[in-house]
Amino acid sequence: MSQKVTPFMQSLKSLPADYRFDGSPVSDRLENSSGASVRLTNSNVPRKGGLRNGVSRTDTAAGDSEDSPYSGHGVFVEEQSLTDDVDSGAATMPLPQSDERRWSDTSAYARKKILQSWIQLPNGNWELGKILSTSGEESVISLPEGKVIKVISETLVPANPDILDGVDDLMQLSYLNEPSVLYNLNYRYNQDMIYTKAGPVLVAVNPFKEVPLYGNRYIEAYRKKSNESPHVYAIADTAIREMIRDEVNQSIIISGESGAGKTETAKIAMQYLAALGGGSGIEYEILKTNPILEAFGNAKTLRNDNSSRFGKLIEIHFSESGKISGAQIQTFLLEKSRVVQCAEGERSYHIFYQLCAGASPALREKLNLTSAHEYKYLGQSNCYSINGVDDAERFHTVKEALDIVHVSKEDQESVFAMLAAVLWLGNVSFTVIDNENHVEPVADESLSTVAKLIGCNINELTLTLSKRNMRVRNDTIVQKLTLPQAIDARDALAKSIYSCLFDWLVEQINKSLAVGKRRTGRSISILDIYGFESFDKNSFEQFCINYANERLQQHFNRHLFKLEQEEYIQDGIDWTRVDFEDNQNCLSLFEKKPLGLLSLLDEESTFPNGTDLTLANKLKQHLQSNSCFRGDKGKLFTVVHYAGEVTYETTGFLEKNRDLLHSDSIQLLSSCSCLLPQAFASSMLIQSEKPVVGPLYKAGGADSQRLSVATKFKSQLFQLMQRLGNTTPHFIRCIKPNNIQSPGVYEQGLVLQQLRCCGVLEVVRISRSGFPTRMSHQKFSRRYGFLLVENIADRDPLSVSVAILHQFNILPEMYQVGYTKLFFRTGQIGVLEDTRNRTLHGILRVQSSFRGYQARCLLKELKRGISILQSFVRGEKIRKEFAELRRRHKAAATIQSQVKSKIARIQYKGIADASVVIQSAIRGWLVRRCSGDIGWLKSGGAKTNELGEVLVKASVLSELQRRVLKAEAALREKEEENDILQQRLQQYENRWSEYETKMKSMEEIWQKQMRSLQSSLSIAKKSLAVEDSARNSDASVNASDATDWDSSSNQFRSQTSNGVGSRLQPMSAGLSVIGRLAEEFEQRAQVFGDDAKFLVEVKSGQVEANLDPDRELRRLKQMFETWKKDYGGRLRETKLILSKLGSEESSGSMEKVKRKWWGRRNSTRY
């Protein structure tokens, strides 16, 4: 395929046209490179005024810049004066107005510029310089800092013009070589444009900082195709659109070395898929699995603060409408050794530090947690924190995520208990018990805490860590363990618990995200697997990780190189083969049977006496002839990977490959009371019963042995590759710009080494010179055949396809027709897709307009029919309502007539009865007036004529009328009198109630007075009794004294005794009067009380009596007042008499008694 080359391009034929990543020239000459660049640039250079997404920059490397006809998605070249005197008079060129001028302006622009080339400095970095002169095999180069050096012309690498600085697709570079790619990525990296396309591959440079490229605004822009710059969102959008359009499962394969940003890139892709396919709520659960998996599967290493120590494949399932219906997570090769051993400056898994920092006081007390530096497993690396990371906050995030994926609170506490048990296991120490260095665990806090957390007996735990039961035939031998053996047993138990816990968590997450009956077969798989690793000391983990990367690189090569070129050849496409670095030899070194690395490793693992040294010797013996293997001294050997040489040390290879946990430890876990250890034991028993699939070795091999770690991992990789092989892959290559994890630092050597590993240059070359878009004749004709103007019903698919291409003026060099497919260069199918979409959109608008017209017509017809139907229905309804009203009116009229007739009959009967009464009264009166003279009545009172009629005199009739009027007047008077009497009766009833109230109050007052009189009387009785006793005592004393004073005078004694007797007689009479007064008081009180009670009963109607209770009550009150006055007078008289009797006595004490008594009496008197 020939193409015209511009004069300027012809002048550059003497320079090396293109370079591979190793810097050597290749057979792909300048014509192909420049020609391709011209065509691609033609589709991207805008017309004048068409700059968009521009940024301002100053090119310090070149030293000058001018207005450029190139816009290039994110580049804006600002005019600046030249710093040197070369070509100082160059004028700026205006932007072209047509396609021809556009290319002519580009050529003129290039001719005006001094040629620029890349030169490699002694430190390995590339520097941009200007070619001042060329003589023979040497050239004079001017460097940016002003130095002028002379170099060999063959070492120079052509540089792209500055108008191509920062292009977003490496396919647009005119010169495709290492320094140009490095410079372009560096330019974009400094502008925070971290994504660059390399053909079908997205190159993502880790910025080590937050960049404003994410969020809902960007998601919406990529969903609507309003932003076409390279991005993870664009890759995810392409995947989901192709899945729906082609009904083929998709995969997004993210690769790169540790610290390149693979985990974050995977999360960004999941974020976009969740935004586009969300709505059911399951997408939120899928996103929340990331904190859980990172906490339990990621750790800080020397190269990465958040390094994934396991591989994962997240398969997101979609419904037919493109909505997420579920997901499934598959994990690979968790680095269990990190649980018990960490290198200096690294950390174990994040969850341990998060638990120690963020556990609540109640949880800390329950798990007996302490700070992280007190656990030996965590303290051996002397690294407990990560700059800028709050472990306590991350722990709460993990707990929230566990809630979202439906892990119960009880299960969460069990998970944390297992983590604490692992930490405390590391603190279990041993003591020597005999001369043979046998040990047993120290019975301290660590041992008891472990037993408590996993729910086992402490004695069983002690036996498991210090002894081992071995079955020999039918006998059981108990072997005591030495210190190294006991430590290995302890660490193996800790690693197994953590590994099983990680698998259990993944299983719980998968249950929460299960698709179930909603599965449709459509899915997008996101692979985030550990990157290529090479350390100062590489062990079994790096061996497996790098093997996985070799397998992924082979998958990458197969899809982008092998299958691509094989398809071109099979379909008869005119194609120039592109060479690429194939890693099949290295992959065969690992997988070849029976003399591959994995086979020899498994074979040595089956030998009881096999050691790490015997393994190294065996590898050197059988693999020394392989070009990818080199045996070193001792336990070292080197493998030449696609990414570079890695030296491994076989120390620990056999132990880690066997991954044996003794049956005693499994039995211990199965005997625990907690559910999780029991589940772990069941899982390990199931795994231990699985034999090796197929005879890996010769007779006497490992058919009955447990699957080794390497074999299991190889099987998982084969299944993974098979699953990815059934999908359409989308590749993202993550690049780590520096090893210090600092933003803004760009290390050329490190980036270049990763680009070489990724094969980016080969990908761009094959994509630029190839046909990335292909479609079968049948599918192409079905998809775009309706765009043809002429009828194509009777034509074959190939003729239809060719007719479509001619109709839309697709240039012949932009496509090729194969035996079964059409092959298009980049961007060509997009033109047809745009036309198809516009046509379909127009068809849809026409259809919608026509369907709208049909719908409106139908609606009008329906409205008319509905109106008619409504009128009929409403008429029928009104007629029924009218008939009902007539029936109700007729029924009402009938009821009214019946009621009125009933009332009339009742009135008539009343009038008739009244008439009879009046007639009887009048007749009686007439009879009484006649004094029984009936004859007069018969003869004179009335006469009968011949016809039998009664004749009444006029005088009699007038008399009767007068009497009737009089009777009526009397009746009215009686009625008025009756009304007056009723009013008076009502007044009497009111007065009666008032009188009854007054009577009750008077009765209460009277009762109080009676009680007062009774109390006064009782006091008087008591006082008189006291005075009587006092007088008697005084009389006896006086008599004795008189006797003693003058015992000889009888006359005196006689007078004394007579005086006492005379005084005692009136006192006795006074007591009798008082007694009668008391009896009278009691009698009267009884009488008055009975009378009052009787009147109350009469008043209340309980007793019938022919008397007026009010008048009788007033009379009774008058009688009580009269008696009271009389009784009071008699009491006063009695007092005076008693006072006179008391005055005749000379004793002062009696007077005091009397005054006291009468004072009480007066105070209590009413």
UniProtKB/Swiss-Prot annotation:
A Gene Ontology molecular function term of the record: cytoskeletal motor activity
Domain Myosin motor, residue spans: 165-837
SMART domains found in the cross-reference section: IQ, MYSc
Domain notes: IQ domain mediates interaction with calmodulin.
Residues annotated as binding ATP: 256-263, 304-312
Gene Ontology cellular component list: endoplasmic reticulum; endosome; myosin complex; phragmoplast; plasmodesma
Domain IQ: from-to ranges: 839-868, 862-891, 888-917, 911-940
Protein name (database record): Myosin-1
Organism: Arabidopsis thaliana (Mouse-ear cress)
